[in-house]
Amino acid sequence: DVYKRQPQGLPKQLLLPTSHEHISLLPSSTALATLERQSPGQSGLGLVIAKSLAQLWQDFDYAVIDSPPLLGVLMVNALAASQQLVIPVQTEFLAVKGLERMVNTLTMINRSRKQALPYTIVSPLFDRRTQASLSTLRLLKHTYPEQLWQAYIPVDTRLRDASRAGLTPSQFDGNSRGTIAYRALLKHLLAQQPASQVA
């Protein structure tokens, strides 16, 4: 856990290999759940991930940071370390309300950055059979025409089956609808900012 090693940074020995060549994993620990209470007011805590990843850029082209949607130390770290943000928003009313708060937070954070953090909104678990999904997707397209990825990730039981089998979607079924959609999303993100970090 990079927070346990702070301020020393991120030793390479913390990285774990995966079944995919050139892809490594840096898992978190359960201590992150209590980080906010453990380190109140500690200086420099919001830059731990950014400083740690800076030591690894000679070995990696991209870093994907998966953080909870709550504004706290983890989210601040992810935003500080990133050059591009991906916001998954299910096509449900409550998820859209949460997106509004997230965008407002980003607007405030961008005022203190040298360069605004671009973001892409993605609609996962989209079910075209339901009116709720269809109407919510229309709302997202109307409200965020520039930020919304115009495609979507469909509901696909093969993704759930892959997780249960302990495999990536491409390993489990490279031709499933969900896998093809995620592949298209990756291509879209890389084309937008080929040298970026994506959070």
Give the residues covered by each predicted segment.
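P-loop NTP-binding core
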Residues: D1-A199
